[in-house]
Amino acid sequence: MDLSDQLFIREMVGKEELGIYSIGYKVGMIILILQAAVVMAWQPFLFKKLKEITPQKKKEIVQLSYLIMLGLVIAAGILYLISPLLFKYFVLSPEYQSGLKYVGIIALAYVFLGWYKMFAGFIIYTKNNKYLSYIAVFNIIFNLLLNYFLIKNYGTMGAAYATAISYFSFFVITAVVSQRVYPMPWISFFGK
C-alpha cells in the first residue's frame, strides 16, 4: 500500500508533486519507526501473557494496549507540532516546504498501522493468520480504489487521506476479527 499512492500521484498529478509529497511522507514515517519498535516488544510480551491468561491479565493487557495506543497518538501529535522546525532546518529547498501539509495525516496513518499490528498479535497467537491475509487483500484493493478516487478529487492530499483511511480500515477490521478469535474486555474495561 505504501507505494500505490506514489504511483497514482506520479501518473495523475506529476513528478514534481510526488517529490513534495515524498518529503512530507518521509517525515510522517518517523512514527513507523517508533511503532515498529513498540510492536517488536509488544508481541513477545503479549504471547507470554496470553499463555498464562487470567481475567486479571486480560484487563492488564487491555490497559497496556490502550496506553500504547494513546502513546502513539501523542507521539504523532508531537511530530506534527515539531514538523515545521524539522522542515525549517532539514528541508532546505523552498519548493519542498509545502510537503509539510502531509506530515500529520501520514503520521496518523502510521498510528493506525501500529494499532493494527497490536491487534494482529491476537490473531497470530490463535494461529488464524489466514484472516490477516484476507484483510490485507481487501485493504490493498480498497487502498487502490481510494487512491484513484481521492487523488482524482483532492489531488496529492487525496493520497495522504487514502493512506490514513486504508490503515484505519486495516485496524478496525483486524480489531473486529481479533475480538472474534480471542475475546478481550475492550469495551467493558471502561465500565469498571
Describe the predicted segments one by one.
Residues 26-29, 72, 76, 110, ...:
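Residue-level recognition of pore/gate-forming positions within transmembrane alpha-helices
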Residues 5-7, 19-35, 66-67, 167:
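Alpha-helical transmembrane segments of polytopic membrane transporters and translocases
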Residues 104-135:
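Membrane-interface junctions at transmembrane-helix termini in multi-pass inner-membrane proteins
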Residues 16, 83, 130, 137-172, ...:
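Membrane-interface helix-loop junctions in multi-pass transport and translocation proteins
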Residues 15, 81-111, 157:
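Interfacial segments at transmembrane-helix termini and the short loops linking adjacent helices
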Residues 54-70, 74-82, 100-103:
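Interfacial transmembrane-helix starts/ends
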